[in-house]
Amino acid sequence: MITISDTAQAHFVKLLADQPEGTHIRVFVISPGTAQAECGVSYCPPDAAEADDVELPFNGFSAMVDEKSAPFLDDASIDFVTDQLGSQLTLKAPNAKMRKVSGDAPLVERIEYIIQSEINPQLASHGGNIMLVEITEAGVAVLQFGGGCNGCSQVDITLKDGIEKQLLDMFPTELTGVRDVTEHEHGEHSYA
């Protein structure tokens, strides 16, 4: 469920040494499954553990996860990174905003999951996003660009070299191509 690097585990052990005995960490998601989802880590004193918590044992401590957050923390990772600017704890939870779908889910759900969990976070750095409009009988994923991608001069490259390549690699037997149906209008909102 959650991977915690050796450096992060050592950091937690050091922090927990100054806490009352039996204190662990709690990893949680506020507003899981929504665009506003936020992840966090806090201390979990012994009297704060709930009966339905999932306990994940690590070296010298446990990570407690509440039942509601658990499915949204699949594939989550915590690391402790040190660089010339200092050190920081990083928590990555790719499924926090949208629950991971099973491999046998309908194609539309699996593509929508990839769009929301992998593609849109990349496009968000430019203020953009895409939406799946439909999948044609010929296996073409019809997409609509929004935000900073609408009217961007790089949209064709993003579509063909980025999104289409990624989706065809992931769904080689189910998709035959990707098509953009956006009526692009370059304006102040456009990234480039």
Curated annotation (Swiss-Prot):
Protein name: Fe/S biogenesis protein NfuA
Coiled-coil region list: none
Keywords (A to Z) from UniProt: 4Fe-4S, Iron, Iron-sulfur, Metal-binding
Purpose of the protein: Involved in iron-sulfur cluster biogenesis. Binds a 4Fe-4S cluster, can transfer this cluster to apoproteins, and thereby intervenes in the maturation of Fe/S proteins. Could also act as a scaffold/chaperone for damaged Fe/S proteins.
A biological process term (GO) from this entry: protein maturation
Gene: nfuA
NCBIfam families: PRK11190.1, YhgI_GntY
Positions of [4Fe-4S] cluster binding: 149, 152
